[in-house]
């Protein structure tokens, strides 16, 4: 069985206002970014839904490169440009010009970090896919688009869905964004990421309603499958 590797896209922001612009747009604190230290974050809609995820790096001239899933690159650029009109920053697609380490879908999934793809853009708020546990969110920085929703979920404990690592006994790979049903046919969540584990099983990161997080059987993509719960490599926060 061949292991699929997730394709990466790259967006460059150059110009004197690039860092200031991103600071008002993304969940992480861009002031912590240095040429020696990358940083991970998300851009959200005003309603707190994730548009795309990224890992940011910069050079000594403060050109900033955002690495993201290739399927979301065009969406990410369009979203950034919508807010960049009053800033001196140039946003460019440089995909294919940056060398990156090859990571398989399964390797990435087993870190407990989901990708946001074209299919799942604007489907989740950050805490639903555990970005607070993964260090993608600064709760100390200033305002950014969607902050009110993200902060409310954090300080009021309003997160009713969380991402879980499941092994499902099926040979067919579910698509990201696929709806998950319980044994009664009721929607209880969505697939965030999926990867083939072996010929008879698939591992997924699934966002599930809290009351259904102990499910042992689910319906997804027209098939009913048994579920084994696997441990995430980090603890999910239980409070602010």
What does each model-identified segment do?
Residues 1-53, 58-61:
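Acidic, proline/glycine-enriched N-terminal capping motif
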Residues 50, 129-137, 151-240:
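Glycine-rich, small/acidic residue-mixed loop/short-helix segments
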Residues 15, 66, 146, 185:
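Residue-level signal for inorganic ion chemistry
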Residues 9, 39, 62, 87, ...:
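A generic structural signal for short beta-strands and their flanking turns/coil linkers
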Residues 2-5, 9-12, 55-112:
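Acidic, low-complexity central loop/insert segments
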Residues 21-22, 76-79, 162:
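Hydrophobic side chains in well-ordered alpha-helices
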Residues 102-167:
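Anionic-ligand-binding alpha/beta catalytic cores of soluble enzymes and soluble regulatory domains
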Residues 26-31, 81-85, 181-183:
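Short, solvent-exposed amphipathic alpha-helical segments in soluble enzyme
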